[in-house]
């Protein structure tokens, strides 16, 4: 007589990428873990380092963010990591953008990540929509406070020449996310998209 497989211990995790960053040629990858009691923790990293010195082209952006989320609504009661969520988001980032003329660099040139970083603290709201057995689309917006230094420079004889230092202190939208989410873990699949419970 065949024995039934022992039930696995439920585990809820997700790997994701923000497709808006991907469209902007900024590769990124994130992970989210369900903590229990409708709470999860998420972290993301993005890194783009494209450049062409001869054409004064720089498209460089890297940083990370982390969120603590609380999930609510009917879908969240059925299964973790789906439905509505609200949370607190923190971002640290630096960038260097130049498209032939004036360049814009976040933070202090030649500094370390802490020196060069801009920081963001924000509140976020989102909704994670099942689209396949192990896939969701997560739509998230965040708004809060962004602060840090920006350096403006011009290309002169093949070298960047400083023009101005500006301190940014900004309240408003800080993040837009449309992420493709891959669900990982025992019992972490969408019932109505090909899974069985």
Residue positions per predicted region:
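Outer-membrane beta-barrel "beta-signal"
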Residues: 65-70, 170-197
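Short loop/turn motifs that connect adjacent beta-strands in outer-membrane beta-barrel proteins
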Residues: 4-11, 38, 73-83, 131-137, ...
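Membrane-spanning beta-strands of outer-membrane beta-barrel proteins
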Residues: 12, 24, 61, 118-120, ...
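Structural signature of outer-membrane beta-barrel domains
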Residues: 48-50, 91-97, 144-150, 183-187
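Gram-negative (and chloroplast) outer-membrane scaffold detector with strong preference
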Residues: 33-135
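Transmembrane beta-strands of outer-membrane beta-barrel proteins
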Residues: 16-20, 42-46, 87-91, 140-142, ...
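Transmembrane beta-strand segments that form the barrel wall of outer-membrane beta-barrel proteins
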Residues: 9-24, 40-53
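Extracytoplasmic loops and strand-loop junctions of Gram-negative outer membrane beta-barrel proteins
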Residues: 11-14, 104-111, 159-165
